[in-house]
A protein has these predicted regions:
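Small-residue (GG/TT-enriched) beta-loop-alpha framework at ligand/catalytic clefts
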Residues: 137-218
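Residue-level signature of catalytic and energy-coupling elements of molecular machines
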Residues: 31, 100, 135, 208, ...
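Phosphate-binding glycine-rich/basic clefts of nucleotide- and phosphate-handling proteins
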Residues: 52-62, 186-297
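Glycine-rich phosphate-binding loop and adjoining helix at the ATP-binding site
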Residues: 106-159
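Conserved phosphate-binding catalytic cores of ATP/NTP-utilizing and phosphoryl-transfer enzymes
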Residues: 2-17, 145-173, 341-351
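Conserved phosphate-binding loops in N-terminal lobes of ATP-dependent enzymes
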Residues: 15-22, 26-127, 274-286
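Helical "lid/coupling" subdomains associated with nucleotide-phosphate turnover
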Residues: 87-93, 97, 146, 153, ...
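Gly/Thr-rich phosphate-binding beta-strand-loop-beta motif of the actin/hexokinase/Hsp70
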Residues: 9-43, 162-191, 238
Length: 356
């Protein structure tokens, strides 16, 4: 039942401190919780959004493991239950509910809490309703449960230490594992939301796996999880270095191989596709619908969040390519941890709502 990052037992005295403000981002690949400990210091829990069940050898009862433990110990039957950040049917909603209840129980998140969770900006009312049921049925959030767009939550840490983003007119890009999202905000109002599943981190991972087979002339086949690990560990737009790994071969023996192109070539194509979608689809639509907002927002920093934004140098490279495509200077800003930003921003909103 493992969660990586800060898996802490931060006993929060709700009687003395009031409801615990909690930010939540349930993602298709990873889930993040963000909340203060009893000293007010931020605590982060980041874990894979997956679970597996097994039968207890002694009692025969069903047991649940989630996150990294489930992925490592039960790769043959681990289940990822979200698509585009949402549980799309009743079965996946039940799985997501089990996962989230186990997570908050193990992190000792109290019922006396104020919960704000980030939601994708896609048109899927049934999925959003299912996600709401997952959060509301978890046993936390007695004080309040609210949702806000993920791109708004993620932009909050990018713009400062408070909630300055809510008072701004700006553009937000979310480079996610299952979607590329873009939208404009005018003082917190969502405008021209755009989402596509054609340009994603997951698809890039699949391309990396395919290119490794091609680069090694068919001698090496890796799964998507391994490809994602290579991307997260080695990808770098500033200073990529070729790396070597070893795999065990069927029948015994080991094979050492070196990767020179298979990580960065797919990422190079990914960025080109992001620029094309943002410049020629999202921004074209925004200019057509809200010309003044388009003009104002392009003259201000564009917030970039999502797991793909964690790759070193990718934000600067995206800034250069987008500016070249638009034939104007653009300024992209990202929080220190783009993958945690949505949960952090959601937590700040929860804190403000409990103060009001």
């Amino acid at each position: 039942m493992a969660a990586d990052s800060s898996e802490t037992d931060a006993s929060f005295d709700t009687a003395a401190d009031g409801p615990l403000p909690v930010g939540v981002k349930l993602g298709s690949t990873r889930t993040v919780l963000y909340y203060p400990d009893e000293d007010g210091d931020p605590q982060t829990v980041r874990t894979l959004t997956c679970l597996a069940t097994y039968e207890d050898a002694l009692s025969g009862s069903e047991r649940v493991v989630y996150g990294e433990q489930a992925a490592e110990e039960y790769p043959d039957r681990v289940q990822y239950m979200l698509r585009s950040g949402l549980p799309e049917d009743d079965d996946r909603a039940d799985l997501a509910g089990t996962f989230f209840r186990e997570l908050v129980k193990n992190q000792k998140i109290p019922a006396d809490s104020a919960v704000v969770y980030a939601i994708p900006t896609i048109d899927n009312e049934a999925g959003l309703d299912n996600l709401a049921e997952v959060i509301e049925g978890s046993g936390i959030g007695d004080e309040l449960v609210r949702s806000f767009p993920e791109s708004l939550c993620g932009a909050i840490p990018a713009f400062g230490d408070d909630l300055e983003a809510i008072d701004e007119i700006f553009l937000a890009l979310n480079l996610g594992s299952t979607n590329l999202e873009a939208c404009a905000y005018r003082h917190g109002e969502l405008m021209s939301p755009f989402s596509t599943g054609a340009v994603t981190g997951n698809e890039t991972d699949r391309q990396i796996a395919n290119m490794i087979e091609e680069e090694t002339q068919g001698r090496v086949n890796v799964d998507v999880e391994t490809a994602r690990g290579y991307k997260e560990e080695h990808a770098d737009f500033d200073d990529f270095e070729a790396f070597t790994d070893v795999i065990q071969q069927p029948g015994g023996g080991a094979h050492e191989f070196t990767i020179e192109r298979s990580v960065m070539d797919p990422l190079d194509g990914y960025l080109d596709d992001v620029v094309d979608e943002v410049a020629n689809n999202f921004l074209a639509e925004l200019a057509n619908d809200h010309m003044k907002v388009y003009q104002l927002a392009l003259g201000r920093p564009i917030a970039v969040t999502g797991g793909m934004a964690c790759i070193p140098g990718i934000v600067d490279e995206l800034e250069d390519r987008l500016g070249e495509e638009l034939q104007r200077d653009v300024d992209l800003v990202a929080p220190d941890r783009p993958d945690l930003a949505a949960a952090e921003g959601a937590q700040r909103i929860a804190e403000r709502l409990t103060d009001d």
